[in-house]
């Protein structure tokens, strides 16, 4: 028994030692460089006239990409924490410029020149000097400031600073004079566009929050995509489901499928070369899905309230023209905005910035209400009005024909069939509306740092990811649909 316990403890110690050797204390992976082929002199490695002590080195059997994911390497490589011996500063890289190997292809140089104060963040926190005292401290002129690349994050805030509004410290931290706030070099990054007035004016990206994809979300999204595919396959293969209402629903489901498919492909980093194009497509299909459901709600209202049961020959063509053209208009608008003002940080608050924070449209600040949230609110409000009007009409008709139910069972059966169709689409509408509402509440909670890591917030995230599964269960896994499939 004692021998087994001894072996177990030895195994734990060896495992801890192995894991600890793969990391350098108080040094992030992106602050290290590969020094496997550099000379070792005494107890240090020489890199471009800089000495990296052996205690700032470690062996890594993986490569960490810009998005934080880790890729195993064929052989372990020795890395040294260069930012402990040389000033480093981060410059953000747009998602569309990140290559498959984790490098950034926006052409920004590896070094920049900045005047820095001969103090560290720790010195400022300990002494708490005034601005006048800071001006008397010698400056640290660095011509070899190493550039670290980091991708944009949701909730990032672009801030423009004049020369007298900031001070760069020699450890890469920045002191903001107006707010007396100190940001460490991993709490901000520089905007990738360096202008002629640099460094008299710099533009920094203030990290307001970090969003990490929760465990299982990607897998749920893959299953949702499969759910959309199966639902579409059933509707396309069963002739009774391909009436005008069914065709509109097929188009709506296809739009939602494309939206989820693009998000899933983006998560697995399969859109490297077409990130911006995929972002515009995702926005286009997102608008299309809500427009198609507005068409469905309008058609249901017209179907129930109109005395003329004859469907116009070109009605579906009219619906198609309306939806796709209407969705294309805001897509062209945000594309034009990005093309004209993308390189102007002063207008960044109003830009959708497709391809910067992901292969999608920026949708968390106030300006996103104009090209994302307000159109969806209008469409959802229209859907509510249509469904309420239809419900009122059905209630009145059922009340009116109740006394004639025994005399004309055929009309009652027809009415019951239409009511069941209506109820089915009401359920679908409620799921879509609830999904959008939960998504907005999730973003609001994250941005306000409310309900973070709570069951309520986590549940809404998982429900949104599983939307394709809910659609499949609602529309396919029921007796009437199975009966149509068997009769096909």
Curated annotation (Swiss-Prot):
Alphabetically ordered keywords of this record: Cell membrane, Disulfide bond, G-protein coupled receptor, Glycoprotein, Membrane, Receptor, Signal, Transducer, Transmembrane, Transmembrane helix
Domain of life where this protein originates: Eukaryota
Disulphide bridges, residue numbers: 27-81, 83-88, 92-189, 93-104, 155-209
Localisation per UniProt entry: Cell membrane
Molecular function as annotated in GO: G protein-coupled peptide receptor activity; G protein-coupled receptor activity
Signal peptide: 1-17
Glycosylation site residues: 19, 34, 55, 141, 365
Family: Belongs to the G-protein coupled receptor 2 family. Mth subfamily.
Name of the protein described by the UniProt record: Probable G-protein coupled receptor Mth-like 12
Species the sequence originates in: Drosophila melanogaster (Fruit fly)
């Amino acid at each position: 028994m004692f021998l087994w316990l001894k072996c177990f403890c030895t195994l734990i110690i060896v495992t801890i030692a192995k894991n600890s050797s793969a990391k350098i204390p108080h040094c992030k992976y992106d602050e290290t460089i590969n020094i496997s082929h550099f000379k070792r002199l005494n107890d240090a490695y020489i890199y471009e006239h800089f000495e990296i002590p052996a205690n700032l080195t470690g062996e890594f059997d993986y490569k960490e990409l810009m998005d934080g994911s880790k890729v195993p390497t064929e052989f372990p490589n020795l890395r040294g924490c260069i930012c402990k011996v040389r000033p480093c500063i981060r410059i953000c890289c747009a998602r569309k410029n990140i290559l498959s190997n984790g490098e950034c292809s926006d052409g920004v140089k590896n070094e920049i020149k900045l005047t820095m104060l001969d103090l560290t963040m720790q010195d400022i926190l300990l002494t708490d000097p005034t601005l006048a005292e800071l001006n008397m401290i010698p400056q640290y002129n660095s011509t070899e400031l190493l550039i670290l690349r980091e991708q944009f994050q949701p909730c990032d805030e672009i801030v423009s600073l004049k020369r007298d509004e900031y001070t760069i410290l020699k450890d890469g931290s920045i002191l903001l004079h107006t707010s007396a706030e100190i940001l460490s070099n991993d709490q901000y990054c520089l905007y990738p566009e360096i202008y002629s007035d640099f460094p008299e004016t710099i533009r920094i990206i203030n990290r307001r929050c970090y969003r990490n994809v929760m465990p299982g979300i990607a897998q749920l999204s893959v299953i949702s995509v499969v759910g959309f595919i199966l639902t579409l396959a059933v509707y396309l293969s069963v002739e009774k489901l391909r009436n005008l209402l069914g065709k509109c629903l097929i188009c709506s489901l296809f739009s939602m499928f494309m939206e989820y498919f693009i998000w899933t492909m983006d998560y697995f980093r399969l859109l490297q070369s077409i990130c911006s194009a995929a972002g515009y497509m995702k926005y286009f299909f997102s608008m299309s899905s809500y427009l198609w459901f507005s068409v469905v709600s309008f058609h249901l209202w017209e179907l129930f309230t109109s005395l003329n049961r004859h469907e116009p020959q070109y009605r579906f063509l009219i619906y198609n023209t309306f939806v796709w053209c209407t969705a294309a208009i805001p897509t062209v608008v945000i594309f034009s905005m990005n093309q004209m003002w993308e390189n102007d940080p002063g207008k960044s608050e109003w830009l959708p910035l497709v391809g910067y924070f992901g292969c999608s449209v920026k949708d968390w600040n106030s300006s996103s209400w104009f090209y994302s949230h307000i159109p969806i609110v209008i469409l959802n409000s229209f859907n509510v009005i249509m469904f309420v009007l239809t419900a009122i009409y059905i209630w009145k008709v059922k009340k009116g024909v109740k006394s004639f139910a025994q005399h004309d069972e055929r009309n009652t059966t027809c009415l019951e069939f239409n009511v069941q169709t209506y109820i089915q689409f009401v359920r679908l509408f409620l799921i879509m509306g609830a999904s959008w509402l939960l998504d907005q509440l999730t973003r609001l909670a994250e941005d306000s740092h409310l309900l973070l890591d709570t069951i309520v917030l986590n549940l809404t995230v998982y429900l949104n990811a599983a939307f394709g599964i809910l659609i499949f269960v609602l529309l396919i896994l029921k007796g009437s649909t199975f009966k149509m499939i068997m009769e096909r």
